[in-house]
């Protein structure tokens, strides 16, 4: 029984990625949203990579049989060829998604290497087992 009650926490990255993919595809033409760091073939631009890089249990009860809440941290990496304004526009949409879902956004870093621009940031929040992320 506890296994079923805790499955929401272990599948949270997939849930968030699915919502983010839907949101980004409706705002940025041709974007590839993925959880896979590597893919075979020619790179696709723009690409948004979602990785859960950490997560702790929150709201633990004395019984501690179920996960009541988690505090996941996601790292978002956006890559694109082209103008700085283009990737910044994509980053604005991604940050807006996380802010609408009540995440804290931090560590926004922009780089360029071999004509490929990258924007990376992190997003974190506490979410309870009965909460639902808004479907934007």
Residue ranges: model-predicted function:
Residues 49, 71-77, 120-122:
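Beta-strand secondary-structure signal
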Residues 89-136:
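Acidic-leaning, charged glycine-interspersed low-complexity segments
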Residues 54-56, 78-82, 99, 125-129:
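Beta-strand elements of well-folded, non-transmembrane domains
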Residues 42, 65-70, 111-117:
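A generic structural micro-feature
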Residues 2-3, 67-82:
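Short glycine-rich, basic-tinged beta-strand/loop micro-motifs
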Residues 1-62:
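Small/polar-rich, solvent-exposed N-terminal microdomains that initiate assembly or binding
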């Amino acid at each position: 029984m506890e296994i079923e009650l805790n499955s929401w926490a272990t599948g949270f990255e997939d849930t968030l990625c699915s919502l983010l993919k839907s949101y980004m595809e409706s705002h940025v033409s041709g974007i590839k949203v993925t959880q896979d760091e590597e893919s075979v073939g020619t790179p696709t631009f723009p690409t948004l990579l979602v990785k859960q890089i950490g997560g702790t249990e929150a709201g633990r009860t004395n019984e501690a049989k179920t996960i009541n809440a988690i505090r996941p941290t996601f790292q978002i990496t956006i890559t694109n060829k082209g103008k700085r304004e283009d990737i910044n526009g994509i980053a604005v949409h991604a940050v807006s998604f996380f802010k609408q879902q009540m995440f804290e956004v931090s560590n926004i870093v922009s780089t360029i290497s071999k004509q490929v621009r990258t924007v990376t940031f992190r997003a974190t929040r506490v979410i309870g087992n009965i909460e639902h992320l808004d479907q934007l």
